[in-house]
Amino acid sequence: MNNMSLEMLEKLEAKVQMAVDTISLLQMEIEELKETNESLTAEANELRSNRETLAQDNDKLQNDHQAWQERVRTLLGKMDHVE
């Protein structure tokens, strides 16, 4: 009986150790996933910021282009009056 109890205890101990090892591995995996998530979040924020900057630059260039077109039209209008 004592021998059987010892064997059961050893099996239980092995199962507990396996569970502890599995939990440790899962915790490490969670940490890696958290780091990956933080990295991807930072990258997404940077891309969002870059997109906003590009949109602002695009708006400015379009406004500059319209202003130049207006100046050219004005100059052409003045030239028409001179002729």
From Swiss-Prot:
Which domain of life does this protein belong to? Answer: Bacteria
Coiled-coil stretches, from where to where? 7-80
Report the main location listed first in the record.
cytoplasm
**Entry keyword set:** Cell cycle, Cell division, Coiled coil, Cytoplasm, Septation
Its GO biological process terms? division septum assembly; FtsZ-dependent cytokinesis
- Sequence similarity: Belongs to the ZapB family.
Q: What is this protein called?
A: Cell division protein ZapB
Q: Which organism is it from?
A: Photobacterium profundum (strain SS9)
Q: What is the lineage of its organism?
A: Bacteria, Pseudomonadati, Pseudomonadota, Gammaproteobacteria, Vibrionales
Q: Provide the gene name from the record.
A: zapB
